[in-house]
């Protein structure tokens, strides 16, 4: 299995990208195609002495984070993310992994790979830590404005991913809302609720944001605006909590001594909330595996993102997504509005 890695995308490219790719290849996860500037990549590889199978596909064009995705794709047809995605389209790689611009990666996937089957809108699905292990949240940024049928399709895709890739039997799917009652929410969520209650999945109804971290819901569905806000808030909350703990610990000798006893537990907790543990987020709903990584991804995150890509390929995710029925045309009925 070959995975195309955009070696020039991300804040820490190419060094951390190459290190992560080498680590994944060394573990036998996959054969790696590093896409980027050959001279720079060879310099990095020379420092690492890779044991796995790695090849380089040269291109010196890069679409930066501050470039408009559509404009960048038009002007730089040989950019690293474009070439890496094209390798998937041509069957020369089974998946693409990138820590570059999310918007550019999405645009490249849609333009080059195309949408899956009857799916109208692709969605970014990410794992979030909970008291009962990682759960799936989607969409987290691909679509800031959605119609009810889009949320319905996100639920179908998330349900499939949770069952196939995460190995969760009969996943519990919930619709993120401002209340658990069926009549709560706006026009978007009311319409989505009516579609989902007749969907071929284990729909448990509306869930509130405060319930997410308890882990009772395996797949949480929302639009990309809300999902991205929750994701960024969660990242900031984790960082802030550990900063608060550190401040309290350093207030006295007694607290420092107590913290020493708790150190193994704190390290375990930090590992659970560390995004590098989860690697990258799949863009569901395109005709190929495209894994989107955090812009500041280090080698560990890249290695784990490649592992996510391998699992998606091994589970036949693209074919399964292409077989989904898409949103039905049933009439959406408005419920009562939230007070």
Curated annotation (Swiss-Prot):
Catalytic activity of the protein: a fatty acyl-[ACP] + phosphate = an acyl phosphate + holo-[ACP]
Assigned GO CC terms = cytoplasm
Q: What are the EC numbers?
A: 2.3.1.274
Q: Which Pfam families match?
A: FA_synthesis
- Record's keyword terms, sorted: Cytoplasm, Lipid biosynthesis, Lipid metabolism, Phospholipid biosynthesis, Phospholipid metabolism, Transferase
Q: In which pathway does it act?
A: Lipid metabolism; phospholipid metabolism
Subcellular localization is given as: Cytoplasm
**One MF annotation (Gene Ontology) recorded for this entry:** phosphate:acyl-[acyl carrier protein] acyltransferase activity
Q: Which GO terms describe its biological process?
A: fatty acid biosynthetic process; phospholipid biosynthetic process
Q: Which family does it belong to?
A: Belongs to the PlsX family.
Q: What does this protein do?
A: Catalyzes the reversible formation of acyl-phosphate (acyl-PO(4)) from acyl-[acyl-carrier-protein] (acyl-ACP). This enzyme utilizes acyl-ACP as fatty acyl donor, but not acyl-CoA.
* PANTHER family for this protein: FATTY ACID/PHOSPHOLIPID SYNTHESIS PROTEIN PLSX, PHOSPHATE ACYLTRANSFERASE
Name of the featured protein: Phosphate acyltransferase
Q: Which organism is it from?
A: Moorella thermoacetica (strain ATCC 39073 / JCM 9320)
Its taxonomic path starts at:
Bacteria, Bacillati, Bacillota, Clostridia, Moorellales
């Amino acid at each position: 299995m070959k995975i195309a890695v955009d070696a020039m995308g991300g804040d820490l490219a190419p060094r951390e990208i190459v290190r992560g790719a080498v680590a994944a290849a060394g573990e036998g996860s996959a054969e790696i195609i590093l896409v980027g500037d050959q001279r720079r990549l060879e310099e990095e590889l020379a420092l690492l002495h890779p044991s796995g199978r790695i090849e380089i596909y040269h291109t010196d064009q890069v679409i930066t984070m501050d470039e408009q995705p559509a404009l960048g794709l038009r002007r730089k047809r040989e950019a690293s993310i474009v070439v890496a995605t094209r390798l998937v389209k041509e069957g020369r790689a089974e998946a693409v992994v990138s820590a570059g611009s999310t918007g550019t990666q999405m645009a490249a996937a849609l333009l080059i790979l195309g949408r899956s089957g009857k799916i109208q809108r692709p969605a970014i699905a990410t794992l979030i830590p909970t008291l009962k292990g990682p759960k799936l949240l989607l969409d987290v940024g691909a679509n800031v404005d959605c119609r009810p049928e889009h949320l319905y399709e996100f639920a179908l895709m998330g349900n499939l991913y949770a069952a196939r890739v995460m190995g969760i039997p009969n996943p519990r799917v919930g619709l993120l809302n401002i209340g658990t009652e069926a009549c709560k929410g706006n026009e978007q969520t009311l319409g989505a609720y009516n579609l989902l209650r007749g969907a071929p999945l284990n729909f448990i109804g509306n869930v509130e944001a405060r319930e997410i971290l308890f882990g009772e819901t395996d797949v949480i569905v929302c639009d990309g605006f809300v999902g991205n806000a929750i994701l960024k808030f969660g990242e900031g909350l984790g960082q802030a909590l550990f900063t608060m703990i550190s401040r309290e610990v350093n207030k006295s000798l007694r607290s420092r001594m107590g913290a020493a006893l708790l150190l193994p537990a704190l390290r375990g907790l930090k590992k659970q909330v560390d995004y590098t543990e989860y690697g990258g987020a799949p863009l569901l709903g395109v005709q190929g595996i495209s894994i989107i990584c955090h812009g500041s991804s280090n080698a560990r995150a890249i290695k784990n993102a490649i592992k996510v890509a391998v699992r998606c390929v091994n589970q036949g995710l693209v074919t399964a997504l292409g077989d989904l029925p898409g949103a039905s045309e049933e009439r959406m009925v408005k419920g009562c509005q939230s007070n």
